[in-house]
Amino acid sequence: MTPESQSLQVLSRSRSPFNDIYVIQRQNLREMWFQGTGELYLQSRIDLSRPGELALVYCRLFLAPLLWNPDPARVLVIGLGGGALPRFLHEVYPELFNEVVEVDRQVTELARRHFFFRESSRLRVFEEDGRSFVQRRQREYDIVFLDAFKGGSVPYHLKTVEFYREIERSLKPGGLLATNLYGQSNRLKPRDRATLESVFPQVTCFEDPDRVATVCVASAQNAGVPEEMFRSGLGCLPESVLRHLSWMENVDMIKKGGILEPGNSIFEDDFEAGEFFRAVRRNNRRDPSPSPPYPIRHSS
């Protein structure tokens, strides 16, 4: 698939120090794509006939932490894309403090211009690397949503056990990390789960039947939550949230075993402490190599 296809209208094509970015439209669907390693990767989608709804299955799965905490007070979103998730949370939780970190100014500008993203006193965007922000901010969150991505890969310093420890320290007691592990094209998910479980005692993964999207929710709490409690506790979610989604569908997507069995190794920082900022700059720039440390490949 290419944005130049006759069935698509290219609304914007731009290049930043971090990404090659397309905004395209076909009928009612408007999408943001990143290009990397010669391929295109979908980042965000809105249905213009229903712009307040979450059009991508991974965004709907990303709301799974609300099954544990139906009334968060402060959340952090690392990676903006088109802004669908923070915009949705801002709408259904008007009192929520929602901080978003996006390293690429061009992505933020395109989200404002084409995807109806607007900031407010309770929805703020910080132009910064996600890990640098977590280290600097020193704030406690109910939920951290980790969704950083660039064309063809994930910045490696945002996938390691050291970063997960930093996130764990930024969570309130009982706080949750939700991380996007992508779909079947990601062959590194077993190592992802092993890395998460080396920091968080409880990790629950969700995956849709077509394996388009995988989201893991990690908690520092030792006790797991039985599915029966999820099912019986759905009524605790605000009506503003319940009317947008089939929450029973989310519960049914809890993944047991299979590809998400923990791997035998974990992701660790590949730099010394004094090299942190150099590693961040290297990992965030557009991929100069066809073999980045954490690649995402399209499935054949």
Language-model features, listed with the residues they occupy:
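Soluble small-group transferase modules, centered on the S-adenosyl donor enzyme superfamily
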Residues: 2-31, 35-37, 202-300
